[in-house]
Amino acid sequence: MGDDAKAKEFLDAADKRLRGGNFFKMFGGGSSRYDDAASDYTKAANLFKMSKKWDQAGAAFQKAAECFLKGSSKHDAASSYVLAAGCYKKGNVIDAITCLKAAIEYYTDEGRFAISAKHQKEIAELYEAEGDFDQAIASYQIASDYFDGENSTVSSHQCLLKIALFSAQLERYEKSIEIYEQVAAASLDNNLTQWGCKEYFLRACLCYLAADDVVGAERALQRYKDMQASFNSTRECRLLDGIIQACRNNNVEDFTNEVAEFNSISPLDSWKTSILLRIKNTINRETESVV
């Protein structure tokens, strides 16, 4: 008998246990009935996993979770929801998120915020992969708060930086600037994290310029130089000095040259390339308005 056929037998057995509800209730076997059904659903789910029938495996784990909830173990229910989500993630994102949220509800009720944060971050990553940046931002914020409450500062900052990244893509520059400056300030006094400050300063200043706030960018750059003396000698700082001046002068050629020089040594990622193109477009608009 193949795995799928065996899985179907376990599903049928679980369904049969649940249909026998009234008889078991009369003799006090209700909780055991749900636990036994959950066990059968779990066996079916594992067989479906072996056959890579991900949706069917996810559905069986989800049914097991629902049985555990009605039975004696909310902990086992949460674990089954997580297993269901792992299967659904292969192609059914909405159901994966639903299951993760169900697991998180249990873990937060139990005060287990570290594991809640981990699964909330998974939800954010699923939304990110789907290109739903608004939902990703909201989910990363919840995860960041959970991590922060557990004093997992690095993990909290990783989530915040994702929010900053997507906020800038959505042209919510003030939010991005706020986060980059917040994370930079928190990183300055730690030898393991202060190296990242030049990147946060660069991104924050680029957001000022993308918002067509040259004066704000100038003031911010000076503030960053004062916050971290070593920033003055970095390529990031020299790039910002150069492109801010180019923006001041509405000089597209100088701007392009500054960016090209930086890119020849430190290749630009897609986010910076996108933001720099927006800044260049603001210079072009200013030049056209003068003409």
From Swiss-Prot:
Per the record, GO CC terms? cytoplasmic vesicle membrane; phagocytic vesicle; SNARE complex
Any idea where this protein resides? Cytoplasmic vesicle membrane
Instruction: State the Gene Ontology terms under molecular function.
Output: soluble NSF attachment protein activity; syntaxin binding
Q: Which GO terms describe its biological process?
A: intracellular protein transport; SNARE complex disassembly
Q: What is this protein for, i.e. what is its function? A: May be required for vesicular transport between the endoplasmic reticulum and the Golgi apparatus. Involved in vesicle fusion with nsfA and probably SNARE proteins.
Indicate the quaternary assembly: Interacts with nsfA and probably SNARE proteins.
Q: What is this protein called?
A: Alpha-soluble NSF attachment protein
Q: Name its species.
A: Dictyostelium discoideum
Q: What is the gene called? A: snpA
